[in-house]
Amino acid sequence: MELSQTALFIGSIINLNALVLILRAWLQFARVDYYNPVSTFAVKMTDPVLKPLRKIAPTVKNIDTSALLLIFIIGMLKGIIYFGLSVNVLLVLGVLTVLKSIGLAIFYVLFIGAVLSWFNRGNNSISYAFYQLSEPLLKPIRRLLPTLGMIDFSPMVVMFILLFLNNFMLDLLGGLWIIAG
């Protein structure tokens, strides 16, 4: 079945919203400064939809479960809207959407952080937010793989791992993995 351009556009908007929701949950989990511009943006974009959900899914141990629940629901709605899938498949699709959104968020944060590190040598709050988000992921890799001069290969290693996992899930789940994100 071929999707129309409108469906692809709507899917892109849905995926972008899922990324902002993951970013919001990740910022809270990493305890990035609330007044950082990246945090402020994520909070302003997501608060209108997350505040009502917090009554159902409160924050647990610094994990914003309301954001994860909303991404789960979004994944299920995509399955209903696009393909009219059964309930069992929708539940799996919701979980896959959360997982794929987390992977995409990690990829984009690492990529943007790496690009910012090339151009920005000063004290910048946006760069610092990306540093706070990526450092817990990169620190174990840096212990195994030392930097060569001023070049840090740890973001590339994590991105290759994400690429491998994405291809593995695509081989394992096929179209369901594509629908998830």
Curated annotation (Swiss-Prot):
It is a multi-pass membrane protein. One of its GO terms (cellular component) is plasma membrane. InterPro entries: CCB3/YggT. It is found in: Cell membrane. The chain crosses the membrane at residues 3-23, 67-87, 92-112, 159-179. The keyword Cell membrane applies. Keywords: Cell membrane, Membrane, Transmembrane, Transmembrane helix. The keyword Cell inner membrane does not apply. Belongs to the YggT family. This is Uncharacterized protein HI_1036. It comes from Haemophilus influenzae (strain ATCC 51907 / DSM 11121 / KW20 / Rd). The lineage of its organism: Bacteria, Pseudomonadati, Pseudomonadota, Gammaproteobacteria, Pasteurellales.
